C-alpha cells in the first residue's frame, strides 16, 4: 500500500530544530511517527523583478495613507505566491499540503490537494497587538482581513493552538465549526518523566523569568513585584534567563542568553526549570508561548497575564495566576503572597500544572489529534 505523502510547507528544512523555536520540528517529528511520508515544500518567494513591483506598491500605499503597509500579507504578494505554490506542489506530487502560518500563499491557491493550515492566532487578532502588526493604513488592514478570511475559507482544515484563536475564527470570520480544530502545542525540550520534587531551603522561593524580550514580556513588572515581597521580608530570588536588564541586586541572577540548540546551554535551562518554584512572565502580548508548556511539564505554577491565548496554558487559581493586563506590581505581589503564606497551595498548583501538561500540553497529544484530522480527510 502506497504511503500517504504530506507536503510540509516551511521556511527551513524540516530537520532544523530552530524553526519557529523548534515547533516546526516537533510537528514534523509527530507526523513521521504515524507512518506518513513527509516532504519539505520550501517557501516560495518573489523574484527580483516582482520584489521591485511590490516595493513600488508598498511605497505608494505609505505615501497615500501616510501609514504603514503590511509587508507580510497583502494582495500583490498573495496573488503571486499562491500561483508559485501551486506550481511547487504540482511538481512534488503530494497527497496533503500542511502549510503553517501561510496566510498569503493559501488565499488564492487553486488545487484539488487537501490543505491543512495552522497558526497560533488569527492575524486579525494581532493587528495593533504585536508591534510588527501595528500602524497599518485602513486599506492595508482591510486587505489583511480579507485575505485571511479567504485563506480560512479555502483550506480544508484550520488548526489553532488556543481557544482564543478558535473562537475568533468562528465568530468573526464565520468559519464552520467542523473546519476549525484546537490542537495545543507541547514542550520543545525534554521534560522529566515524573513530577520533580522541590524543596524550599531556608525559606527561599525561586522565581524564573525565561524570555528574550524584556519589554514585551514585562520583566520590569516581575522585578518590581518581587521587590515588594522582598521588602516585606520574604526570601525570594529572581533568575532572569534570556535578557540582560540593568539590575544590580544580590537576590537577582541574570543569565543573558542560553541557546537551546547547544546541549550545555539546554541543560542549564532544564536545571533552572527543575530548581525554580515559579515561572513568572507577566507578558504584555502573546499567543501561546511554548515556554508555558515546558514549565507545566516541569510542574511549575505559572504567573502571567490574561491576554491573547495565554489562558490556553494557564488556569487561573488552578495551575497558576493570571491577572488582567492592567494589574500592577502590587496586585501581583498580593496574589503571590497568598501562596507564600500557604505553601501547600504551591504544591497543589504544581501538581495541577503537571497534570495539564500530561493531558493537554504535550506533542504526543498533538500528534494523535493531527493523525485523526488526516484520517478524516482521507475518508472523505
Language-model features: locations:
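A short, well-ordered alpha-helix in the C-terminal region of glycosyltransferases
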Residues: 338, 345-360, 366-372
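Nucleotide-activated donor-binding/catalytic signature segment of Leloir-type glycosyltransferases, i.e.
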Residues: 242-278
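Conserved acidic donor-binding segment of nucleotide-sugar-dependent glycosyltransferases
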Residues: 316-317, 321-329, 338-343
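Short hydrophobic beta-strand element within catalytic cores of glycosyltransferases
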Residues: 301-305, 314, 322
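Aromatic "clamp/platform" in nucleotide-sugar-dependent glycosyltransferases that forms part
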Residues: 284
Amino acid at each position: 500500500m502506497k504511503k500517504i505523502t504530506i507536503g510540509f510547507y516551511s521556511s527551513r528544512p524540516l530537520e532544523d530544530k530552530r524553526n519557529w523555536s523548534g515547533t516546526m520540528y516537533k510537528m514534523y517529528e509527530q507526523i513521521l511517527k504515524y507512518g506518513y511520508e513527509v516532504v519539505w515544500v520550501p517557501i516560495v518567494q518573489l523574484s527580483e523583478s516582482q520584489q521591485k513591483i511590490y516595493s513600488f506598491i508598498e511605497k505608494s500605499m505609505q505615501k497615500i495613507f501616510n501609514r504603514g503597509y503590511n509587508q507580510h500579507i497583502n494582495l500583490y504578494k498573495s496573488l503571486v505566491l499562491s500561483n508559485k505554490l501551486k506550481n511547487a506542489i504540482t511538481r512534488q506530487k503530494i497527497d496533503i499540503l500542511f502549510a503553517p502560518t501561510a496566510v498569503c500563499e493559501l488565499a488564492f491557491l487553486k488545487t484539488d490537494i487537501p490543505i491543512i493550515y495552522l497558526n497560533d492566532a488569527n492575524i486579525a487578532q494581532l493587528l495593533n497587538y504585536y508591534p510588527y502588526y501595528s500602524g497599518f493604513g485602513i486599506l492595508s488592514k482591510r486587505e489583511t482581513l480579507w485575505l485571511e478570511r479567504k485563506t480560512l475559507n479555502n483550506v480544508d482544515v484550520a488548526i489553532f493552538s488556543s481557544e482564543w484563536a478558535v473562537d475568533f475564527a468562528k465568530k468573526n470570520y464565520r468559519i464552520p465549526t467542523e473546519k476549525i480544530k484546537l490542537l495545543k502545542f507541547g514542550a520543545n525540550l525534554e521534560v522529566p518523566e515524573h513530577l520533580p520534587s522541590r524543596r524550599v531551603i531556608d525559606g527561599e522561593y525561586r522565581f524564573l523569568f525565561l524570555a528574550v524580550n524584556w519589554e514585551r514580556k514585562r520583566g520590569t513588572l516581575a522585578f518590581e513585584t518581587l521587590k515588594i515581597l522582598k521588602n516585606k521580608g520574604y526570601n525570594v530570588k529572581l533568575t532572569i534567563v534570556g535578557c540582560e536588564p540593568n539590575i544590580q541586586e544580590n537576590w537577582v541572577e541574570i543569565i543573558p542568553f542560553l541557546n537551546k540548540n547547544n546541549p550545555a546551554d539546554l541543560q542549564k535551562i532544564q536545571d533552572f526549570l527543575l530548581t525554580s518554584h515559579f515561572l513568572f512572565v507577566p507578558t504584555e502580548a502573546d499567543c501561546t508561548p511554548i515556554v508555558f508548556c515546558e514549565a507545566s511539564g516541569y510542574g511549575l505554577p505559572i504567573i502571567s497575564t490574561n491576554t491573547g491565548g495565554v489562558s490556553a496554558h494557564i488556569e487561573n487559581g488552578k495551575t497558576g495566576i493570571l491577572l488582567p493586563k492592567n494589574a500592577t506590581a502590587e496586585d501581583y505581589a498580593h496574589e503571590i503572597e497568598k501562596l507564600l503564606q500557604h505553601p501547600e497551595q504551591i504544591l497543589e498548583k504544581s501538581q495541577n500544572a503537571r497534570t495539564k501538561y500530561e493531558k493537554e500540553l504535550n506533542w504526543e497529544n498533538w500528534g494523535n489529534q493531527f493523525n485523526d484530522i488526516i484520517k478524516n480527510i482521507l475518508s472523505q
